[in-house]
């Protein structure tokens, strides 16, 4: 009896590392994008948790009036936030080593910039990792394309908007009430509700929710029962089964009669493309709108557009919105300026006789 021993070629440590990184047999795929994604998202998450709990007040407006955002400084889960980097820093890169001390770095809101920059890199790498895993498995790349919509939205509020406004202090605070404050101030300064791209985004999000609910309920209502009445219909599905799990003809017939025939998809692939494309395209448009408003290309302005024969203004809903915008604008950053920008923009009258 002859035993043949095959000599395994010795592979370098680097080659084995590369094979492990790109292996689709791992419980969680890492990938080359994951090599960057994991440390950046861990850093952003860790600093966010620490700052949300214990960060000292931040001089957000750069006028020596610190604003408290952490739990240990009097906030709760609703009011708490990681306060954006100070207006005194503007758009300057502000890592820890650029500050004279850790206290100064915290006072100027350094953690916000650290979190946002690492988070941005992390979510971009997550998108790349989705593409990378799809590529390794021989799948099409549309999962990463769909994820690009929330990435674009996050990029708009955390990166593009501060760049357009000239300071990271204008970025969205990392908290619940901070998010709402950002939305209110954004409406006051940019009239976002009257921007067509934001309207498309609203249609995308609400429409996507409606279509998702319609699709899920139709499928659930037209399952092909493989079980008795005494057990759940869900128990009749076997993972990887070749048979259809629901009757698309029945679903098509129901919806076609509920609305009209051509309102219902008879092609499952077209249907699922539509379900993905509708909210993604809507959110793309919203991100694009935010990015244009970052540079003060604002929503449509119909203020005082209706006048009578004597030239008197007849107020419309646009004028009511404008008055609300002015009220919100004078209330935010109360001590940083005395008047809203559009009231302070007029040239002062001459006092010379």
From Swiss-Prot:
One of its GO terms (molecular function) is oxidoreductase activity, acting on diphenols and related substances as donors, oxygen as acceptor. Residues 345-353 form a propeptide. The modification N-acetylthreonine is found at residue 2. The modification Phosphothreonine is found at residue 2. It comes from Chlamydomonas moewusii (Chlamydomonas eugametos). This is Photosystem II protein D1. It is found in: Plastid, Chloroplast thylakoid membrane. SUPFAM superfamilies: Bacterial photosystem II reaction centre, L and M subunits.
């Amino acid at each position: 009896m002859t035993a043949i021993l095959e000599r395994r070629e010795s592979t370098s440590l680097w080659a084995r590392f590369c094979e492990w990184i790109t292996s689709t047999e791992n419980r969680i795929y890492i990938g080359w994008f994951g090599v960057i994604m994991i440390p950046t998202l861990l850093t952003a998450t860790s600093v966010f948790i620490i700052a949300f709990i214990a960060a000292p007040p931040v001089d957000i407006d750069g006028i020596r009036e610190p604003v408290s955002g952490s739990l240990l400084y009097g906030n709760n889960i609703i009011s708490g936030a990681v306060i954006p980097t100070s207006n005194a820093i503007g758009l300057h890169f502000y890592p820890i080593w650029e500050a004279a001390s850790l206290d100064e770095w915290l006072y100027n809101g350094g953690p916000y910039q650290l979190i946002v920059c690492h988070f941005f890199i992390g979510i971009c790498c997550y998108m790349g990792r989705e593409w990378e895993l799809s590529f390794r498995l021989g799948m099409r790349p549309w999962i990463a394309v769909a994820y690009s919509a929330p990435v674009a939205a996050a990029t708009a509020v955390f990166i593009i908007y501060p760049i357009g406004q000239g300071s990271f202090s204008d970025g969205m605070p990392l908290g619940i009430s901070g998010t709402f404050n950002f939305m209110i101030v954004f409406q006051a300064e940019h009239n976002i509700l009257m921007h067509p791209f934001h309207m498309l985004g609203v249609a995308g999000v609400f429409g996507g929710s409606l279509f998702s609910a319609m699709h899920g309920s139709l499928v659930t209502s037209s399952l092909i029962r493989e079980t008795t009445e005494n057990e759940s219909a869900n128990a009749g599905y076997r993972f990887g089964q070749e048979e259809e799990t629901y009757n698309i003809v029945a679903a098509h017939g129901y919806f076609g009669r509920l609305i009209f025939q051509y309102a219902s998809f008879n092609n499952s692939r077209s249907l699922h493309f539509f379900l993905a494309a509708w909210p993604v395209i809507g959110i793309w448009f919203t991100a694009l709108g935010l990015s244009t408003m970052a540079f003060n290309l604002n929503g449509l302005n119909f203020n005082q557009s209706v006048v009578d024969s004597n030239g008197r203004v007849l107020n419309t809903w646009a004028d009511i919105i404008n008055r609300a915008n002015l009220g919100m604008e004078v209330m935010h950053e109360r001590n940083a300026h005395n008047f809203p920008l559009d009231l302070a923009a007029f040239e002062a009258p001459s006092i010379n006789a």
